[in-house]
Curated annotation (Swiss-Prot):
Highest classification ranks of the organism: Eukaryota, Metazoa, Chordata, Craniata, Vertebrata
Subunit description: Interacts with PTH1R (via N-terminal extracellular domain).
Recorded GO CC terms: extracellular space
Main localization of the protein described in the UniProt heading: secreted
Protein name per UniProt: Parathyroid hormone
Domain of life from the UniProt record: Eukaryota
GO molecular function, one term: peptide hormone receptor binding
GO BP annotations, alphabetical order: adenylate cyclase-activating G protein-coupled receptor signaling pathway; bone mineralization; cell-cell signaling; homeostasis of number of cells within a tissue; intracellular calcium ion homeostasis; magnesium ion homeostasis; negative regulation of apoptotic process in bone marrow cell; negative regulation of gene expression
Biological function: Parathyroid hormone elevates calcium level by dissolving the salts in bone and preventing their renal excretion. Acts by binding to its receptor, PTH1R, activating G protein-coupled receptor signaling. Stimulates [1-14C]-2-deoxy-D-glucose (2DG) transport and glycogen synthesis in osteoblastic cells.
Subcellular locations according to the entry: Secreted
Species assigned in the record: Gallus gallus
Key words, A-Z: Cleavage on pair of basic residues, Hormone, Secreted, Signal
UniProt-listed Pfam families: Parathyroid
């Protein structure tokens, strides 16, 4: 076994090395500008991917009726603009009214509109 004197010397030497290096948890070498830019870009990329994943998760349950409207033929000349169907926007007052309706009422209203607009 090691003697107490040798153990004490080793402890003093290790303490002196740790005390005089004075790293304070910082890296010993400074990072280069390219390394900092790479880390910044990686952080931005991770943040963007997290936002896209969150948005994709929120949009999974959203139903878009625009795809159904694009497949239908236009009924009026005013609906045709340079060969394309003009998209109808949902105004804020219509949106508030739609939110207040129950899902069953929305399904019935959607089916009524769908059957009325077919040629």
């Amino acid at each position: 076994m090691t003697s107490t004197k040798n153990l004490a010397k080793a402890i003093v030497i290790l303490y002196a090395i740790c005390f005089f290096t004075n790293s304070d948890g910082r890296p010993m070498m400074k990072r280069s500008v390219s390394e900092m830019q790479l880390m910044h870009n990686l952080g931005e990329h991770r943040h963007t991917v997290e936002r896209q994943d969150w948005l994709q998760m929120k949009l999974q349950d959203v139903h878009s009726a625009l795809e159904d409207a694009r497949t239908q033929r236009p009924r009026n000349k005013e609906d045709i603009v340079l060969g394309e169907i003009r998209n109808r926007r949902l105004l804020p007052e219509h949106l508030r009214a739609a939110v207040q309706k129950k899902s069953i009422d929305l399904d019935k209203a959607y089916m009524n509109v769908l059957f009325k607009t077919k040629p």
